[in-house]
Amino acid sequence: MASNGKSNAVSVCPGPIKRREFLRIGLSGFATLSLPGLFELRARAATEKPKARTAVILVWLRGGASHLETYDPKPDAPSEFRGVFSPISTCVPGMQISELLPRHAKIADKFTLLRSMAHTGGGHPAGSLQMLTGDPDPQDKDKPIFPDWMTVANFLRADPKRPLPNYVGVNPVTRYDNFTIAGPAYVGPSYGPFTVNGDPNDPHFSVPNIGYKDQAQSERLSDRIRLKQSLDRLDRAIDQSGTMRAIDDFEAQALSLLTSPGAREAFDLSREPDHIRDLYGRNQWGQQCLLARRLVEAGVEIITTTFDGPLCGRVANWDDHAVNHNVFDALKFRAPYFDQAVSALIEDIYARGLDKRVLVVVTGEFGRTPRIERVASSGGGVASAAAGTVQPGRDHWPRAFSNLWAGGGIKTGGVIGATDKHGEEVVSRMCTPGDFLATIYRHLGIDAGQITIPDFSGRPNLILPRGAPIPELERQS
């Protein structure tokens, strides 16, 4: 197992790094970091290095989507389980999905469904931490104690010589209410996401601090950086730890973000033709996915995008309890946006020849209870009916749920695993969060069972102590 045997002397990050903070840190240096083994660790990380630099786009359904109303319908179950929507056939013989997803159905040959995910985290924080960090603890926590896979991959694969950050969160996966559901933990905040907030469909949307449009500004900044580098020359000459080398790299990337026209262009959706923007949908989720595609084309390797907010309905996420709103009304409202955005992303990835390099994963922290709950509305906050109105809902269900995999060179047009006739329990090919994460790491060329990263005390920790890549999702030669 590879380890540099030393820790990063940094504090735990409470959330993603803001754009200004990212650039400020990059330009002021990382004097507090202890990084002598970083470059050796990165060199050892990719024991099965892909032929091309691979990428992952994670579409996160915050709150947990119902598997029965998306990828694992149960038309033969009793009415108290099956819900009001019917299944439809897809272009893949024998594969059915919810009628809410007709666009998915037309491109089912381009994705694989995993219907047998299960874990023990019944709360939003615990479920999210299990899926994103591999933490097996079923109890909720305020913040992660293990780094999420995105931060780890960024730590191991970051190349500061490129003009763009390697990990971008487009409406990032970081929080659920007051809980931090993803973060760098002991890897250190400098490897968190470059965050892009706001609605990319807004005509006034822009990403601040990316690429000066004024060439004179760029030249003045470059002059200042060159002056700073000349003053630092003596320190670099006597440095033996590798720390100054790391500072050079972080400074180079921060400068590149500010001065590179290519960096600015990658985030500029106005450069897309109208028919492509229409393909994804002229709404927040559609344009988030389009931005994700632009970023992987530009070389970004780790992208997360969260589907929540107004397009989910009044609850603003996928947490479809009856006390919040009528689950079926909510799903009927949000499904067209979800269906179009995800299907367009998959189609576009294949149309552009990115399907071998880019893996798309769609999931939430868990599924929803197969047995429909009928509970009186709370009548307040995000509730969709007057207080006392009895309405249907589905609660948290981590014991069996589904996710979607597309691209990544995997064999598509299939289904992995199965749940019972009610969708309550996994009956074949159970997969755990460790398996889920190991599969993502494998696509990124990272041997998760061998690489260690030191924690705050300097003790080496396997980046994934349990789990194995899912064989059915292995890249095809």
Identify the residue ranges that each predicted region occupies.
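Ligand-binding pockets and gating/stacking loops
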Residues: 1-477
